[in-house]
From Swiss-Prot:
GO biological process: cytoplasmic translation
PANTHER family according to UniProt: LARGE RIBOSOMAL SUBUNIT PROTEIN UL2M, RIBOSOMAL PROTEIN L2
Comp. bias intervals (Basic and acidic residues): 229-239
UniProt keyword annotations, A-Z: Ribonucleoprotein, Ribosomal protein, RNA-binding, rRNA-binding
GO CC annotation terms, alphabetical: large ribosomal subunit
Biased composition (Polar residues): 39-49
Protein name: Large ribosomal subunit protein uL2
Entry keyword annotation includes rRNA-binding: yes
Encoding gene per record: rplB
Function: One of the primary rRNA binding proteins. Required for association of the 30S and 50S subunits to form the 70S ribosome, for tRNA binding and peptide bond formation. It has been suggested to have peptidyltransferase activity; this is somewhat controversial. Makes several contacts with the 16S rRNA in the 70S ribosome.
Superkingdom of this protein's organism: Bacteria
UniProt xrefs under InterPro entries: NA-bd_OB-fold, Rib_uL2_dom2, Ribosomal_uL2, Ribosomal_uL2_bac/org-type, Ribosomal_uL2_C, Ribosomal_uL2_CS, Ribosomal_uL2_dom3, Ribosomal_uL2_RNA-bd_dom
Family to which this protein belongs: Belongs to the universal ribosomal protein uL2 family.
Length: 274
């Protein structure tokens, strides 16, 4: 994997920094594991915008990634690593001994030819998936379940990981990259190691159009709008009326807590620091 800076042959190329990986598959993805992906443009069934800054972008196929890793006791060989337009991490196409193929999130250091396992008896090796009760304290994990059997929900993006810092009774304690310490049931599964493509954060798109290719529309400052559109709108010159920064709906936007799920507060040992 290499970080390549473009030569300034044009204004749009001047700041581009790409992350290249010669180990990724050059051909088409595995067709039986593809699904259609329709775009909503951020609108709901009434045609109203419910998610801002969404629209356009290149047409994509969804890769059906196995986040449960529930095929226990059967070895699988990594056939190839692939690019996935739907996520920052790379994915791996694995083939089980019985012939079934699945996509999984590729872990750091995974290459074609690796053997991976899942289940309580799987070896302690990067890329293998085990229940948290079978993973040694101090291990680095990713693709962590929050409910047994539901599938991985935590630490799935490029370079992400969590550390298993304690085990007590029915729960283990994980330290997440955000600084949050969280309890998770020991029956939940996690994959050993870190997520691949950690250099993803080093890339620079270089121009607004590259962001539009990804289906992201521009973000307009509230102070640049009219009073009818935003609490900061209007005024002569640059002015936001002297009030603290808020969203278009008047909710404070810097440091204001909006988390409403009190039921799972008991599982958060320490709040995130970033």
């Amino acid at each position: 994997m290499a970080v390549v800076k473009s030569k300034p042959t044009s204004a749009g190329r001047r700041h581009v920094v790409k992350v290249t990986n010669n180990d990724l598959h050059k051909g088409a993805p595995y067709a039986p594991l593809l699904d259609t992906k329709s775009k909503s443009g951020g609108r709901n069934n009434n045609g109203r915008i419910t998610t801002r800054h969404v629209g356009g972008g290149h047409k994509q196929h969804y890769r059906m990634v196995d986040f449960r890793r529930n095929k226990d006791g059967i070895s699988a060989v990594v056939e190839r690593l692939e690019y996935d337009p739907n996520r920052s991490a790379n994915i791996a196409l694995i083939r089980y001994a019985d012939g079934e193929r699945r996509y999984i999130i590729a872990s750091k250091g995974m290459v074609a030819g690796n053997i991976v396992f899942s289940g309580a008896d799987a070896p302690i090796k990067a890329g293998n998936t085990l229940p948290l009760q079978n993973i040694p304290v101090g291990s680095t994990v990713h693709c962590v379940e929050l409910k047994p059997g539901k599938g991985a929900q935590v630490a799935r993006s490029a370079g992400a990981s969590a550390q298993l810092v304690a085990r007590e009774g029915r729960y283990v304690t994980l330290r997440l990259r955000s600084g949050e310490m969280r309890k998770v049931l020991t029956e939940c599964r996690a994959t050993l190691g870190e997520v691949s493509n950690s250099e993803h954060s080093l890339r620079v798109l270089g121009k607004a159009g590259a962001t539009r290719w990804r289906g992201v529309r521009p973000t307009v400052r509230g102070a640049a709008m009219n009073p009818v559109d935003h609490p900061h709108g209007g005024g002569e010159g640059r002015s936001k009326g002297g009030r603290h920064p808020v969203t278009p709906w008047g909710v404070p936007t810097k440091g204001y807590k909006t988390r409403s799920n009190k039921r799972t507060d008991k599982l958060i040992v320490r709040r995130r620091t970033k």
